[in-house]
Amino acid sequence: MEIKELQDIIQQNGVVGAGGAGFPTYMKLTDKANTILMNCAECEPLLKLHRQLLEKHAYEIMKTFHMIQETVGASEAIIGIKKSYVQTINALNQHIEEFPGMRLHLLDEVYPMGDEVVLIYEATGRVVRPGGLPIEQGVAVFNVETVYNVYRAVEEKQPVTDKYVSVVAEVSDPVTVRVPLGCTLEEVVAQAGNTTVKDPVYFVGGPMMGRIGNGSDPVTKTTNAILVLPKDHLIVAKKQRTSSIDLKRAASICCQCNTCTDLCPRHNLGHPIDPAKFMRAAANQDFRDLNPYIDASFCSSCGVCEMYSCPQSLAPRSLLADMKGGLRKAGIRPPQGVQPKPVQESREYRKVPEERLMARLGLTKYDKDAPLHEDLVQVKKVKILLSQHIGAPAQAI
């Protein structure tokens, strides 16, 4: 199949990244990619969707991944998967010899392994420059559900009209279900039995980078999980704090320990983001050196600094996000052509173990099986948002 033909099929069937920002998948198909990489790292704690889907549909997904490899002419296809996903690895190994040029790369159980910049370095040794795209290093990254959606578009002529979503935490029966796009979060949560706390909060996405949602919010193409949490949970409290309070707390109790920078995944890959310098400058309203503010553009918002590193429970990630938003509104673009410094020699010792992260966040008790149910959940009506991805909104037909 030619690249243009596959691009047209993918675009016409509405396939975008099934997580993150929802980058249009057809735009990743280019003959500049000498390596394609499938992301099965489940970036966030408690998420199990991708390993479940890849185990259940291993052959179909691998076949499609190989087809993408041949279409773009990539010399190598890598499946990045955490070494603890034993059942999924076994399912892949049953078919791996059928696909020349494809290999598994086993990953450590650390966060944020699913960040594509981190994943690319782990799997290939290449460093994507600050503000750059993976294709600049000859790599195109796809997550598991996205590849499965390409399979359904090519083989079954099926557009993306449904989504796999995990429902976990304070529910009686944690589950991963297939639901129509546009159904409400409440309808999805109902598939997991009863909520087990009064006045639950729906946290959409993972605990590190997710957001607080309303029960009436619609499921979109990037909705991966709903965490049902008590209203007084640590994660909920952190999300509900205001920037003005965060800034005052930084000015009064930051101890200048530098741990937020020491553990920053992007900083350790040589990117110029430096949360400690930013917090010091912002807390003291110090504008003599603008670099800490400008370099906020290179923050990935992974949340390690805010949710794990800081012994004072400050909020570097939230303040950096506000700064990025302010720079965009002011028309200030990230510096172009910035090259990374050498990767930190101590990077291996600065990784965040996912098990320890879950304990720090008070999530360990929620780490339970959430079985995959593939029968499509039936609902009476849906609300389809036209903008479910990066770029121009879709058009109704």
Predicted segment positions?
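Hydrophobic alpha-helical positions that pack around
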Residues: I78, K83-C183, Q191-K198, G206
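Flexible, glycine/charged-enriched surface loops at secondary-structure junctions
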Residues: V72-I79, T196-G205, C264, D289-P292, ...
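Gly-rich Lys/Arg/Thr-decorated short loops/hinges at beta-loop-alpha junctions or inter-strand turns
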Residues: M38-H50, V171
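Histidine-anchored nucleotide/phosphate-binding helix
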Residues: I36, K56-V72
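Ferredoxin-type iron-sulfur electron-transfer modules in oxidoreductases and energy-metabolism complexes
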Residues: L229-A251, T261, H267-K351, M358-E374, ...
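Conserved phosphate/anionic-ligand binding catalytic regions in large, soluble enzymes, centered on
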Residues: G14-T30, M307
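Ubiquitin-like/PB1-type beta-grasp interaction modules and other compact soluble beta-rich domains
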Residues: V165-E170, T196-P230
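Active-site loop ensemble at the mouth of alpha/beta enzyme cores that anchors a bound cofactor
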Residues: Y111-V139, G215-I245
